[in-house]
């Protein structure tokens, strides 16, 4: 079922533009798709209904089947549900998430695009973790860290290089890790569940965790039974 493209200027309740954002743009299938993909092995087919809660609620035996499939890691039926997201995030976040090999990824390329760069600046600067080699600790007491001047200088340098005739694929080398990028990210229900199960853990980077929780919310809305079965309810 297609949903069409969504406006890509999302805001929070205060009207502030969210710099890191996952927008659902398309999806296919439902919880019933999981059930019927499994039951076809026996030449069977189910349908929605039969329980209180609305026309698109699984029958009790079908809900139990979905949880059984997830518990025993019978993943192929979950592969018949598919979603696509349009993601906007800084490069340093994107380079962590691209490692999930079963999700399809097509990203904007500054070999071809020379639009003025946008930069991500966190709301809070976090302290260095003291008990591990990676990660971060609580917010710094001294938040007097300013990168705006550097960002403006980098943007000016980038634009001047292009103006002098330097090709896009070389001019991009001066852009920092907090430059915003965007990509289409598509995959099956089980592939996104695997990503979210990993990226929502407490020891993951906050920025990637934030993005994973946004995807979690969309997938939970689309596939409430299947998503819960695969993620055990992300907290």
Predicted regions located by residue number:
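Family-specific signature for flavin-dependent thymidylate synthase
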Residues: 2-235
């Amino acid at each position: 079922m297609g949903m069409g493209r969504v406006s890509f200027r999302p805001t929070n309740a205060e009207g502030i533009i969210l710099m890191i954002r996952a927008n659902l743009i398309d999806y296919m299938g439902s919880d019933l798709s999981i059930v019927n993909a499994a039951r076809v092995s026996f030449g069977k087919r189910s349908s929605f209904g039969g329980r209180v809660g609305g026309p698109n609620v699984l029958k009790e035996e079908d809900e139990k089947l979905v949880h059984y499939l997830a518990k025993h890691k019978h993943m192929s039926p979950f592969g018949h549900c598919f979603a696509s997201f349009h993601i906007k995030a800084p490069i340093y976040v994107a380079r962590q998430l691209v490692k999930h090999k079963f999700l399809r990824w097509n990203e904007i390329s500054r070999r071809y695009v020379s639009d003025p760069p946008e930069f991500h600046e966190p709301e809070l600067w976090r302290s260095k973790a003291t008990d591990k080699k990676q990660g971060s600790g609580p917010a710094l007491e001294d938040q007097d860290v300013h990168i705006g001047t550097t960002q403006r200088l980098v943007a000016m340098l980038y634009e001047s290089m292009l103006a002098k005739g330097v090709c896009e694929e070389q001019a991009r080398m001066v852009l920092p890790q907090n430059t915003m990028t965007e990509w289409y990210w598509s995959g099956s229900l089980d592939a996104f569940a695997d990503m979210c199960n990993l990226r929502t853990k407490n020891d993951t980077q906050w920025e990637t965790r934030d993005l994973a929780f946004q995807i979690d919310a969309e997938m939970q809305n689309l596939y409430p039974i299947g998503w819960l079965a695969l993620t055990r309810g992300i907290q």
